[in-house]
Swiss-Prot record:
Protein family membership: Belongs to the alpha-IPM synthase/homocitrate synthase family. LeuA type 2 subfamily.
Enzyme class at the top of the EC tree: transferase
Name this polypeptide is given: 2-isopropylmalate synthase
Biological source species: Paenarthrobacter aurescens (strain TC1)
Region (Regulatory domain), start-end ranges: 456-579
Length: 579
């Protein structure tokens, strides 16, 4: 087949391929052969990196609510601000410490640039904290060395070293606080690897990195510049060239400029990283920081404990939306409104069958569904494990088929329609959505079903020729049944008698004597719930004249439900003939 694409005409000559800017060569890379088997150390940066990207930065009350959410979820390292950059951030750090909001096993993290007055102010903010991470950074990229700082490699290294030495100096003022150091060569992805390692190793020496006194070396994709595999290669290269490796915690801080922040974090973790920084639902500058929700739940669905509690995803989302004053998109992985919703007919049918198979397999294994291995088509995770219901799993629009319609009827009303009845009713829904457009809600679906198959007694006279009243039967020794039925025919109350080998056959006899050409082709029934007092649902497929169609009946009596189903089919045929 010929490719008909044509050149875009866009100014591609203005952009340089990444490989022409930075060399990343790891021909003996090992990360592609690895799999994730345990969670990394997490650091949530919503209160600093996320907050600085908001149109309306968080108020102190919203900041505290976000901090409390992160603690509740299980994050043990939380970046809480840039206390030397604003009085607001300084005051919030003091509020957390003085207000006793920091659990003993949680380390707050604060950011600072490599300038003395900023570092001094940073340490002032930490007085009284049990433990803290001081995060020092300066930009090292080729571009920023040239256009921002006008410095060569040695000049940028001197800035970093001066900052590290000042941190050590002011650490002496915090005798009751355990300090862990973190250093970021900001814009790492735009920095030559050899130079990045030179700077990081020099900083690790100043901070006296060792197995007993580990230093966090954070390698941010401050701007995502290449494909995730390139980022992973750069992390593996650094993993091999940072010293002493046992004294280094390699941390990742991916952004999402190319839309692959999650993939970059996962591959970078495979490549030797120990820790990942990010934000809930991917908030952050430009296209955002890596999404901690997606990362954590990607591990969960592979059977790896993320060490973070996502079991009430809607509450997490509501809190994040309140604090950030930004909506979480409907398609945001795991947390969006539509991520567990299927509109497609084939998807709905597969999901319906998947639920049925899951129940069957769990019962065969002697386990509850909630404790059985989750395998349902199109649903990589059980919504219930995130605190969601199944209500939104299947929704009906013009793209939906019988599977989705049948699922909603069974899940919400315990009606298990035979397959051909599913096909028939999905056609009714299809005609409705084609004519009106939009989505059909669960309540609307049920109303359409009732109008089509289960009119109330008051409505029967309006569209149905026949109404079923009281019925009595007698069976002789040969098994033949005589039925006396009170019917409403064209609005007139009448009493009719019929004979047959059962209730349906006897009612058919009555209808035949009234001139109705009807034959029963198929019949099924089931209880609507467990217990002796449960109502029954009956489904009767009939040939009425030239039409083949279904009737449905619901009644506490199984016999009456089957008779109602037969009347339903006949009435539908009469209504269609009159339409």
């Amino acid at each position: 087949m010929r490719n008909a694409q044509k050149p875009s005409g866009m100014p591609i000559h203005r952009y340089l391929p990444f490989q022409d800017q930075i060399t990343v060569e790891v021909p003996d890379r090992t990360w592609p052969d690895k799999v994730i088997t345990k969670a990394p150390r997490w650091c949530a940066v919503d209160l600093r990196d996320g907050n600085q990207a908001l149109i309306d930065p968080m108020s102190p009350a919203r900041k505290l609510k976000m901090f409390q959410l992160l603690v509740k979820m299980g994050y043990k390292e939380i970046e809480v601000g840039f206390p030397s950059a604003s009085q607001t951030d300084f005051d919030f750090v003091r509020q957390l410490i003085e207000g006793g909001h920091i659990p003993d096993d949680v380390s707050i993290q604060v950011l600072t640039q490599a300038r003395e007055h900023l570092i001094e102010r940073t340490y002032e903010s930490l007085v009284g904290a049990k433990q803290a991470i001081v995060h020092l950074y300066n930009s090292t990229s080729v571009l920023q060395r040239r256009v921002v700082f006008n410095q060569d490699e040695d000049g940028i290294l001197d800035i970093a070293l001066q900052g590290a030495r000042l941190c050590k100096k002011y650490e002496e003022t915090l005798t009751d606080t355990h300090i862990t150091y973190e250093y970021s060569p900001e814009s790492f992805t735009g920095t030559e690897l050899e130079y990045a390692a030179r700077v990081c190793n020099a900083i690790a020496d100043v901070f006296e990195a060792s197995a007993d006194k580990q230093v966090i070396i954070n390698l941010p994709a401050t701007v995502e510049m290449a494909t995730p595999n390139v980022y992973a290669d750069s992390i593996e290269w650094m993993h091999r060239n940072l010293h002493p490796r046992e004294g280094i915690i390699i941390s990742l801080h991916p952004h999402n400029d190319r839309g692959t922040g999650v993939a970059a974090a996962e591959l970078g973790y495979l490549a030797g990283a120990d820790r990942i920084e990010g934000c809930l639902f991917g908030n952050g500058e430009r296209t955002g920081n890596v999404d901690l929700v997606t990362l954590g739940l990607n591990m969960f669905v592979q059977g790896v404990d993320p060490m973070i509690d996502f079991s009430d995803i809607d509450e997490i989302r509501r809190t994040v939306e309140y604090c950030n004053q930004l909506p979480v998109p409907e398609r945001s992985p795991y947390g969006g409104d539509l991520v567990f919703t299927a509109f497609s007919g084939s998807h709905q049918d597969a999901i319906k069958k998947g639920f049925e198979a899951l129940e069957k397999d769990a019962a065969a294994a002697g386990k509850s569904v909630d404790d059985f291995t989750w395998q349902v088509p199109y649903l990589p995770i059980d919504p219930k494990d995130l605190g969601r219901s199944y209500e939104a799993v299947i929704r009906v629009n013009s793209q939906s088929g019988k599977g989705g319609v049948a699922y909603l009827l069974k899940n919400e009303h315990n009606l298990d329609l035979p397959r051909r009845a599913q096909i028939e009713f999905s056609g009714v829904i299809q005609r409705r959505t084609d004519a009106v457009g939009g989505e059909v809600s669960g309540a609307q679906l049920w109303q359409i079903f009732q109008d089509e198959y289960l009119p109330s007694d008051e409505e029967q006279a309006q569209w149905g020729r026949y109404g079923l009243g009281s019925v009595s039967t007698e069976t002789d020794e040969s098994g033949a049944m005589t039925m006396n039925a009170n019917l409403r025919i064209d609005g007139v109350e009448v009493r009719r008698t019929g004979h047959g080998n059962g209730p349906i056959a006897a009612l058919l006899d009555i209808l035949h004597h009234d001139g109705v050409d009807v034959r029963v082709l198929d019949y099924s029934e089931h209880a609507l719930s467990e217990g002796g007092s449960a109502s029954a649902a009956a489904y009767v497929e009939c040939a009425v004249g030239e039409r083949v169609l279904w009737g449905v009946g619901i009644d506490p009596s199984t016999t009456t439900s089957s008779l109602k189903a037969l009347i339903s089919a006949v009435n539908r045929a009469v209504r269609d003939a009159q339409a």
